From Swiss-Prot:
Keyword DNA-binding recorded: no
Single GO biological process annotation from the record: cell division
Keywords, comma-separated and alphabetical: Cell cycle, Cell division
Function: Possible 'checkpoint' protein for cell division in the blooming process.
Protein name: Blooming-related protein 2
Organism for this UniProt entry: Prorocentrum triestinum (Red tide alga)
UniProt-annotated stretches for the region Disordered: 1-20
Note: On the 2D-gel the determined pI of this protein is: 4.8, its MW is: 21.5 kDa.
Amino acid sequence: VSAEYLERQGPKDDXDCFDD
């Protein structure tokens, strides 16, 4: 998971859609 993704999505509340 990239930092940019974390900044956009925040904490994983949607499940493990992206485990990259």
